[in-house]
């Protein structure tokens, strides 16, 4: 597996202390970790879990804006934007990094996302992806997909910045649809990675 020290994990937090207490220990130690907080400063017990940079926004400007701030602060070549209620399985970051290096034509990658009951999560609230079709035919191998959910996006920082990141006029919901369309149209395919 590849060394993950060239990956920044960007997390947007809004009243997410409980979720962060599960996520933070699952992130590989060599990854830079950035939490953009749209609420109040995180408590000491969260800060004791691992090293991370916290950026405290003076106001909640939404998910996309906070992601853009986190990616701008990232010092690594790759960023992995994840929701705070995520927990990484072993080698998730390394597998995504390895696949991204094997598929330089792709614009971004998304892992298989499981709910707490281990059923596969579905990207909600998108007119770009039919839920019934996805659940019946979702790929069991690395495949191109029409849209990614904002819950987990692995992308080169350079690509994200080149595209201007998330549209900050979209406060919450559908900012991932917009980014997906721009990535597909201007950079390259979106790739689903079911073994991560």
Residue ranges and their predicted role:
Residues 6-8, 32, 178:
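Cell-envelope/extracellular polymer assembly enzymes that use nucleotide-activated donors
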Residues 24-59:
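Acidic donor-binding segment of Leloir-type glycosyltransferases
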Residues 187-196:
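Catalytic beta-strand/loop signature of glycosyltransferases that borders the donor
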Residues 11-29:
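Short, well-formed alpha-helical segments that are part of the catalytic scaffolds
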Residues 40, 61, 85-87, 170:
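Acidic metal-phosphate-binding loop of nucleotide-sugar-dependent transferases
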Residues 57-74:
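Glycine-rich, basic loop-to-helix element that forms the pyrophosphate-binding segment
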Residues 79:
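Short aromatic/hydrophobic "clamp" motif used to bind/position activated sugar donors
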Residues 56, 68-69, 87-164, 169, ...:
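Acidic/His-rich active-site region of diverse nucleotide-sugar glycosyltransferases
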